[in-house]
């Protein structure tokens, strides 16, 4: 009997040792946007408990993800500290991909590199731009991840920030298309006001009238139908359903409004999304205030 109890206890210990890690608590904590250091600390403990392969990769990309937020919280004047945390986040993502390639690993690698580049300055970080797109190409084309609002947002910001040819591959129309799919794929459990704001600002700056929109969007539709690679195809997402399509935030067709009219509608829609939620992160509040300021400036 005593031997049986010892065997059962040994089996129980083994079962606990090999039990899969539960990310429910740490993911919920991350979404509050208020406990990033606690999330980081919990994940470093989980990393030591993780088994090799997929489980370890899932801890590592979460560490990479929270590094973006930790870096964003550092004063912008302290570039050295920001560089350090973004580089740490990039390394976690690289280790995650090495352990088990996932879309999240590639996404958060690019996000940390992107933040590093924004801190450094566009012209000082041009060399990192193409590798970022190549990583996102793996995520979107090879791994088939088409519903990541964050990935499309990274592409939108990248194409909007970079200079165009011959210096680099910046393209405002591609940026707007990527911005549209970023908005269309925002998960229901988050607000992402900054994503709506980014698209609105890009449209405001492009400033096409309704006639030009109708003409150019029809051309985009032809390219959309022709392209086969997802990352190339979605450069023309604005024309996916033609100039008579209705975007998420209005019952007015794309061809019946100007860029700036739509930009204002998008910001008002983002305000309504925020006001319809009971809980908000600090980032949500900050984005809401910035959107209100833009609307005051534009209207």
Enumerate the language-model features and the residues they cover.
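A contiguous pocket-lining binding segment that forms or flanks enzyme active sites
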Residues: 135-142, 150-155, 161-167, 171-194
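Bacterial N-terminal signal peptides
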Residues: 7-15
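Helix-turn-helix repeat elements of alpha-solenoid scaffolds
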Residues: 30-46, 78-94, 125-135, 169-178, ...
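TPR/TPR-like (Sel1-like) alpha-helical repeat modules
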Residues: 127-137, 170-183, 217-232, 252-278
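Amphipathic alpha-helical repeat scaffolds of TPR domains
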Residues: 20-31, 53-76, 100-120, 145-163, ...
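Positively charged n-region of N-terminal signal peptides that target proteins for export
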Residues: 1-4
């Amino acid at each position: 009997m005593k031997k049986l109890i010892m065997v059962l206890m040994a089996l129980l210990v083994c079962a606990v040792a090999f039990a899969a890690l539960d990310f429910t608590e740490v993911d919920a904590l991350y979404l509050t946007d208020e406990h990033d250091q606690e999330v980081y600390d919990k994940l470093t403990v989980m990393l030591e408990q993780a088994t090799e392969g997929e489980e370890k990769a899932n801890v590592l990309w979460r560490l990479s993800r929270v590094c973006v937020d930790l870096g964003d919280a550092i004063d912008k004047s302290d570039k050295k500290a920001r560089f350090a945390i973004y580089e740490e986040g990039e390394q976690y993502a690289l280790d995650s991909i090495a352990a088990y390639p996932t879309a999240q690993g590639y996404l958060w690698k690019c996000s940390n590199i992107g933040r590093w580049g924004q801190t450094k300055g566009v012209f000082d970080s041009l060399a990192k731009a193409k590798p970022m797109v190549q990583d996102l190409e793996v995520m979107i084309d090879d791994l088939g991840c088409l519903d990541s609002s964050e990935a499309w947002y990274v592409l939108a910001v990248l194409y909007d920030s970079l200079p165009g040819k011959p210096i680099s591959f910046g393209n405002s129309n591609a940026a707007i298309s990527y911005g549209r799919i970023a908005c269309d794929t925002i998960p229901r459990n988050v607000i992402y006001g900054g994503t709506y704001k980014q698209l609105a600002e890009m449209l405001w700056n492009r400033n096409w009238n309704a006639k030009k929109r109708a003409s150019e969007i029809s051309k985009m539709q032809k390219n959309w139908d022709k392209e086969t690679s997802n990352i190339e195809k979605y450069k023309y997402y604005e024309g996916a359903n033609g100039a008579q399509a209705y975007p998420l935030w209005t019952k007015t067709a794309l061809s019946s409004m100007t860029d700036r009219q739509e930009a204002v509608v998008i910001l008002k829609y983002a305000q309504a999304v925020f006001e319809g939620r009971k809980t908000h992160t600090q980032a949500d509040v900050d984005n809401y205030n910035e959107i209100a300021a833009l609307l005051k400036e534009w209207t």
